[in-house]
Amino acid sequence: MCAAQMPPLAHIFRGTFVHSTWTCPMEVLRDHLLGVSDSGKIVFLEEASQQEKLAKEWCFKPCEIRELSHHEFFMPGLVDTHIHASQYSFAGSNIDLPLLEWLTKYTFPAEHRFQNTDFAEEVYTRVVRRTLKNGTTTACYFATIHTDSSLLLADITDKFGQRAFVGKVCMNLNDTFPEYNETTEESIKETERFVSEMLQRKYSRVKPIVTPRFSLSCSETLMGDLGNIAKTHDLHIQSHISENRDEVEAVKNLYPSYKNYTDVYDKNNLLTNKTVMAHGCYLSAEELNVFHERGASIAHCPNSNLSLSSGFLNVLEVLKHEVKIGLGTDVAGGYSYSMLDAIRRAVMVSNILLINKVNEKSLTLKEVFRLATLGGSQALGLDGEIGNFEVGKEFDAILINPKASDSPIDLFYGDFFGDISEAVIQKFLYLGDDRNIEEVYVGGKQVVPFSSSV
C-alpha cells in the first residue's frame, strides 16, 4: 500500500553517485537509489537494499527504475562562478598581454560589438550550449554594457534551462577605449531597467546580478549607486578584485583615501553576503578578514590567472580565513570554457605554491572537486538549493560515462572490481571532456542532449 499524498516522481535512478559534503570532499555512494520529484527536487537517496521500503513509500514499480551501467556515475552539476559570456567570441585566442593592456587591445573592442543584438544572439547561444554540454549547470555571467543584448543572454539561458546569474556590465571610466563607456546616469538608468525587466520576466532559475566591472572603470558615485540598487532589490553583486599587481597599484593611485582595494568596494556598499569577487590573488590577511566578516565570496580563476600572467591565488589561505570560494573559467582571460579545466588548473596552482614553499601542503583533487560543485554553490548563495545530492535540494546533475563513444579515457581491468573505483572518477576529472558527459539535468529537467526546441 502506497503512502498517501506523495508527489509523483520524475526520475528514479539506481547506480553510483559522487558528491561532496562539508565533512567529506568526495563521497562515493555505490549502488544507491535516488528519487527526483516532479518539481525537480531530490526526495530520497538511499542504499538500493531499501528499494522495497522506498517503493511502498513513493509508489513506484521496479520497471520505473533506471539502472546505470556499472561504469557510469552521476555527479553534481558544475558551478562556474565567473565567466564573461561576451568574451566567448574570442576564447582561445589573444592571451598574449597582461590584464590592463589585454582589456584595451582585445576585450573592450570585442565587447563593443554587442550593441548588435544579432551578433550577441549568436555568441550567447553558442556559449550557453557549449557550457551546458560541458557540464556547467550554473553560470555567473558578465554580459556587456548593452542592456538589450544582456537581456537577450538571460532569455537564452532560460530557454536552454541553465541556472544562471546574468549581469549587465557597468563602467563610466574608460579612457583607453572611450567608445565603450557609459555616463554615470546612463549606467544607473540602464541597470535599473535591466533589473526591472529581468524581475518582471519571473525566470525560475535565471536572476539579475549587479555588475560594476571593477574599481578602475567605475567612479565612486557609480559604485555607491549600484550598491544601493543591489540593497533595494536584495540582489547579488559581482566584480573583480586584486587580479594583477599593476591593477592593484592603479586602484591605489585612483582611490588614495581608501585603506586598500577591498575597502573601495566595502565603503561603497558592494561587499555583502551576496557578493562574489573574481581573482583576489593579492588580497592581504586584513582584506580576507573583511571578506569573512561581510560574508563575501571569491571566484578562483586559475586558467586566467596563469594565461594573463596575473598571479597565484592561495586557496588554502582563503579557506583559513573562512571565506567562501568557488571556481570560475573566466572566459576569455581563461581560454577554456570547461570547468574540468578549472579543476585541473586549481590543483596545479596549489602544487606550484607547495613547490615554492608558500604552503606546506597542496589542495587534493577531491577538495578541488568540492570547490567546483558545493563550494561554487555556496559562493553564489545557492548551497541550500544545489551543490550536492542532499535530500531537499534540486537535482542539478551530470551523468558521466567513462566508456562513451570516442572517449578520451582508456579504462583497464584494474579500474573495476565489481563497482566503479575512485581511479575511474579521477580519470574523468583529469582526462574527461564533453564526450563523457552523456546527460545534463537542471532542476530535475534533462537539458542535454538538447531538445529540438532549442
Curated annotation (Swiss-Prot):
A Gene Ontology cellular-component term: cytosol
Q: Name one GO biological process term.
A: guanine catabolic process
In which organism is this protein found? Pongo abelii
Alphabetical keyword list? Hydrolase, Metal-binding, Phosphoprotein, Zinc
Query: What's the protein called, per UniProt?
Result: Guanine deaminase
Q: Where does Zn(2+) bind?
A: 82, 84, 240, 330
Q: Which reaction does it catalyse?
A: guanine + H2O + H(+) = xanthine + NH4(+)
What does the Swiss-Prot or TrEMBL cofactor note state? Binds 1 zinc ion per subunit.
Subunit annotation: Homodimer.
| Nucleotide-binding is among the record's keywords | no
**GO function term, MF aspect, one:** guanine deaminase activity
Q: Which gene encodes it?
A: GDA
Q: Which residues bind substrate?
A: 84-87, 213-214, 240-243, 330
**Pathway linked to the protein:** Purine metabolism; guanine degradation; xanthine from guanine: step 1/1
UniProt keyword Hydrolase, yes or no: yes
Q: Which principal EC class is assigned to this enzyme? A: hydrolase
Q: Can you tell me which family this protein belongs to?
A: Belongs to the metallo-dependent hydrolases superfamily. ATZ/TRZ family.
What are the names of the required cofactors?
Answer: Zn(2+)
